[in-house]
């Protein structure tokens, strides 16, 4: 009985944190930096913490495709809260994480190959660097 109650509370907590991350990612502005002056008005709807989270995950991580992480968090939270079977959700989460990685690296490769603009804004810095590694490793230029 106590374990069921803890899983419900944990599910609600995961949903709340995931919604916070989701709004942080949706309010991401590439022109905002966490190290800007305290006098500058922050436009992220979740404040300075949302700015830091979106900066780390979107700009320094795998880009805009990271919006799927809070979606998976909401699904996991609801599954724990409703005490449903999570066998299929494990497989969906694994495929989702693989999709995030591959899509970000593919976008990075596309921006490196076909664009003259900055190639880390949409795929993220990590996705772009991994794509750049593969371009250098597999090319003969």
Predicted stretch roles:
Residues 1-141:
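Alpha-helical transmembrane segments used as membrane anchors
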């Amino acid at each position: 009985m106590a374990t069921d109650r803890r899983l419900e509370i944990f599910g609600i907590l995961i949903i709340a944190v995931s919604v916070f991350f989701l709004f942080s990612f949706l309010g991401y502005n590439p022109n905002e930096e966490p190290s800007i002056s305290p006098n500058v008005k922050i436009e992220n709807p979740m404040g300075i913490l949302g700015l830091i989270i979106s900066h780390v995950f979107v700009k320094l991580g795998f880009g805009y495709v990271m919006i799927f992480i809070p979606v998976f968090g909401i699904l996991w939270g609801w599954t724990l809260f409703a005490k449903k079977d999570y066998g299929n959700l494990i497989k969906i989460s694994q495929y989702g994480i693989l999709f995030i990685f591959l899509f970000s690296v593919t976008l990075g490769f596309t921006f490196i190959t076909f664009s003259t603009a900055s190639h880390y804004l949409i795929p993220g810095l990590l996705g772009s660097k991994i794509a750049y590694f593969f371009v250098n490793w597999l090319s003969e230029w």
